[in-house]
Every structure is written in C-alpha cells, then in structure tokens.
C-alpha cells in the first residue's frame, strides 16, 4: 500500500515481538535505575513508563515500542525478588564488592538479567545474557559490558547449570 492509499501517512514499520522484548528490557533497566537513584516507587515508575515513555516521544527522544507486560514483569519481579537476586549478584562478582560500589546502571542491568535467568525459563540463557550485554554497551564503552557478561554467565551456571554458548 502506498502512502497515498494510506491517507498520505507513511506506514510505520512493525516491531517484532523479540524487539519489543528488547525495548522492554532497556526500559526496565532505566526504570530500575530511576527507582534506585531517585527513590521512586515501583507502582509510580511503572505507571509513568507505560503512560508516557514506552513507544512515546519524550524531549525529542523516541522510545521504542516495548512489550508492556514484559516490562512490568521485569520491574516488579526485580523489586519483589531483590532479596534473592542481590545475593546471587554479589556471589558472582569476583571480588567481595558490595552492590553499592557498582554503578547504578550496572546494578540495574545485573538485577534485571538475574531476574530473567531465575524466572524466564522459556528464554534461553544466551538470549538473556546477550540482550543485557547489548544494553550495557549502550551505556558504557569499556569494561562494564564484559562485567555484565561474566556475572550473568556465572549466575546462569549456578542457577540453570548452563552458560551462554
């Protein structure tokens, strides 16, 4: 269908469900960061993202269309299971570092990735680890993506008995 047949509006490319999940993961990391740094509550941040950010334009930046249920599942699951997630992350760090020493964005990435490894058995470990390493690359240029890869890989081995292949 041409633009003219569509009322003159250009057609929007469809977003594949996998890409919507990736966008939901990125948004979840951003929401978890916002909660960690700003002290925002889970209900407030989820409502804000669903109403004003997911698939919307904010201050000239267009947020990708995201799977809202995937986003909600990650954010609320990390908050609900944080007492289970944080010890796993701490034990996977090579040195005895408290999570508070990690950058808040790295903390959010590791918590979200760990939640998915624990809860989303339908998603292969390789997909989870790769997605969160890519999110780390969007924020960092140096060692942080390697750290995310190593920590999530160790957690996957411990929890699922498998590593990223």
Curated annotation (Swiss-Prot):
Pfam families found in the cross-reference section: NusB
Keywords in alphabetical order: RNA-binding, Transcription, Transcription antitermination, Transcription regulation
Keyword Transcription regulation: yes
Gene3D superfamilies named in the record: NusB-like
Gene Ontology terms describing biological process: DNA-templated transcription termination; transcription antitermination
Region spans: Disordered: 1-20
Molecular-function GO terms, alphabetical: RNA binding
GO-annotated cellular components: cytosol
Keyword hit for Ribonucleoprotein: no
Family: Belongs to the NusB family.
Function: Involved in transcription antitermination. Required for transcription of ribosomal RNA (rRNA) genes. Binds specifically to the boxA antiterminator sequence of the ribosomal RNA (rrn) operons.
Protein name per the record: Transcription antitermination protein NusB
Organism of provenance: Agrobacterium fabrum (strain C58 / ATCC 33970) (Agrobacterium tumefaciens (strain C58))
Upper lineage: Bacteria, Pseudomonadati, Pseudomonadota, Alphaproteobacteria, Hyphomicrobiales
Primary gene name: nusB
């Amino acid at each position: 269908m041409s633009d003219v047949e569509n009322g003159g509006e250009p057609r929007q490319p469809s977003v594949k469900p996998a890409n919507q999940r990736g966008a939901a993961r990125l948004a979840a990391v951003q929401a978890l960061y916002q909660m960690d740094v700003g002290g925002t509550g889970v209900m407030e941040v989820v409502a804000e993202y669903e109403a004003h950010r997911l698939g919307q334009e904010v201050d000239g930046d267009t947020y990708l269309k995201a799977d809202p249920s995937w986003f909600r599942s990650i954010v609320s699951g990390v908050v609900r299971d944080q007492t289970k997630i944080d010890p796993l992350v701490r034990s996977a760090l090579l040195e005895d570092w408290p999570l508070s020493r990690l950058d808040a964005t790295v903390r959010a990435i590791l918590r979200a990735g760990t939640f998915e490894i624990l809860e989303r058995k339908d998603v292969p470990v390789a997909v989870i680890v790769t997605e969160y390493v890519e999110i780390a690359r969007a924020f960092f240029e140096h060692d942080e993506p390697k750290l995310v890869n190593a920590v999530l890989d160790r957690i996957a081995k411990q929890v699922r008995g498998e590593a990223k292949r």
